[in-house]
A protein has these predicted regions:
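Short glycine/proline-rich turn/loop motifs
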Residues: 4, 8-13, 131, 141-142
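Generic detection of intrinsically disordered/low-complexity segments and helix-coil linkers/edges
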Residues: 3, 76-78, 146
Length: 201
């Protein structure tokens, strides 16, 4: 989930700068719009904004990070990232902490999703490869002790999760994500077969 991004804008973005704050590809549109002269586009679209004869009232998930890019601010405007697997919220990151709400125990895309009773807690600054989890070999007393000492961490994500869920309520997604779940596809096919009076078309 971490990829490099190189930006060059002579006279505006200082050369040779490293920025390691949280950013997302979702931020690019809002930030580039600000650079093009529309710094309030995200807020305008929330209220309804007309472009080329069409009024759009939508929620953009991105943050305007132009001040961060230009050095006017040393902190990213974004503090949180939400991780989805198709339509399922699997994790949330706030600052250096990541909470895995849903997991795939073997780390493979093919794995069944599982939802532990307590989120897996990772400090990404200490463990950027996310190797210290309850599924990891050798996660014994010290791992459990660290995990237990950080059970306060999920409370920090609460306000971010609440705001995210409110945005989905106020601005429902226009199109849901499809799924590649074979179980779901088979269940749907079986329901159609069980409907003896249903159409065969």
């Amino acid at each position: 989930m971490r990829v490099p991004c190189l930006i060059k804008w002579p006279g505006h973005i200082p050369a040779g700068q490293d920025r390691n704050g949280i950013q997302s590809h979702e931020d690019l549109f809002v930030t580039l719009a600000a650079a093009a002269g529309l710094p309030d586009l995200k807020q305008d679209l929330l209220k309804g904004y007309s472009m080329n004869g069409t009024t759009y009232k939508v929620h953009l998930d991105g943050y305007n990070n132009l001040d961060y890019w230009t050095g006017a601010s040393m902190r990213s405007a974004r503090r949180e990232i939400f991780y989805y697997d198709e339509t399922d919220l699997m994790a949330v990151r706030v600052d250096g902490w990541k909470l895995d709400i849903g997991v795939k125990h073997h780390g493979d895309w093919f794995d069944e999703k599982a939802y532990p009773s307590v989120p897996y807690i990772t400090n990404l600054l200490m463990d950027p490869m996310e190797r210290v989890t309850p599924d990891a070999p050798g996660f014994e007393y010290e791992g459990r002790k660290f995990f237990a000492s950080k059970l306060w961490a999920p409370t920090g994500a609460g306000p971010f999760l609440a705001a995210h869920l409110k945005s989905l309520e106020d601005y429902p997604p226009r199109q849901g994500a499809d799924t590649l779940s074979m179980k779901r596809a088979i269940d749907q096919a079986m329901r159609k077969l069980e409907n003896a009076h249903g159409s065969s078309n």
